[in-house]
Structure formats: C-alpha cells, structure tokens
C-alpha cells in the first residue's frame, strides 16, 4: 500500500489536472491505496443471490497480480486494476494493458483522462464521479443495497446530490 504522502506526490505529478483530494478519495474507495488491487466483475448470469457481483483481490506483488489477471481473462470476465481501478474495457481506448495499470503513475494518468472526461460530460464533480464509477452520471448517486444503501459518491465522501455545483 502506498502512504498518503507518496500517493499525493504521485497524484500531483501524474494526474495534475485533478485535485489531489479527489484522486485520494477515489483511490481510498477503489483500492485502499493498493497499486495491485484487482476487482473481478462477475457477469450477472453467473452471480448467486445476494452476491455483490465483484470479487476483490489484494496481491502483494505485480507478479502475483498478473497471475490473477491471467486467470480472470481465461474466464472471460471483466476486471478493474490498480490504485484507481481502471476497468479492462478501457484498456484499448487508452492504449494500455493490465500490466501497465499496475504502475501507479500510469494508472493515475489514465484515471485523470477518465475523470476529466466524466467531469466535462456530467457538468459537476458528483455527476463526474458517478460517471467514473459506472460510465454514466446517474448510477453512482443511487444507493446500493450491497454497500449498506450508500451510493458511490457517498462512499467517496459526498452527501446525496443537492444540485450544488462541485468542481474537479
């Protein structure tokens, strides 16, 4: 795990157009600051009743993380990796790979592109964070039973939307 000071220094260097507090809170929720964190996304058809639909892995090395990714890919499941949990479906769009996404700076660079794009499309930070989470500005503000009826943006640290503008 990265220390707060190391993470913030990397965030300011590698994702300078996003406020370091924003990247810090996203990384806290997404990976717990573990650069090798992996979330395997279980297809809905394969989920058991009550499952969250995600299996989390927290390997301690890049080599161990790459082995887990290889096994997930053999199952043809989507997954997210690294500090900011970049989803495998974004790799081609951003010209990257799972291996590159285990590099904290590279992961932050891609997350910056996604966050800025989502912020522009959503019009404010809350909707932008929802988009970062789900690809749209609505899903991430809805309470989720599997997360104690909190929304993604609440887990990041925002109250439910109150129509005030927030900035990236």
What are these regions (language model features)?
Residues 23, 38-53:
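Early exported N-terminus immediately downstream of N-terminal targeting peptides
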């Amino acid at each position: 795990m990265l220390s707060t000071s190391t993470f913030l220094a990397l965030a300011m260097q590698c994702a300078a157009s996003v406020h370091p507090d924003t990247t810090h809170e996203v990384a806290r929720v997404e990976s717990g600051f573990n650069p090798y964190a992996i979330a395997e996304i279980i297809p809905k058809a394969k989920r058991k009743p009550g499952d969250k639909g995600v299996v989390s892995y927290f390997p301690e090395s890049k080599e161990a993380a790459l082995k887990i990714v290889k096994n997930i890919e053999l199952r043809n499941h989507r997954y997210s990796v690294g500090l900011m949990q970049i989803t495998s479906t974004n790799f081609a769009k951003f010209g990257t790979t799972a291996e590159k996404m285990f590099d904290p700076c590279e992961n932050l660079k891609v997350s910056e592109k996604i966050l800025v794009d989502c912020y522009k499309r959503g019009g404010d930070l809350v909707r932008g964070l929802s988009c970062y989470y789900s690809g749209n500005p609505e899903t991430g503000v809805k309470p989720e039973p599997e997360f104690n009826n909190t929304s993604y943006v609440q887990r990041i640290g925002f109250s439910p939307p109150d129509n005030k503008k927030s900035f990236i």
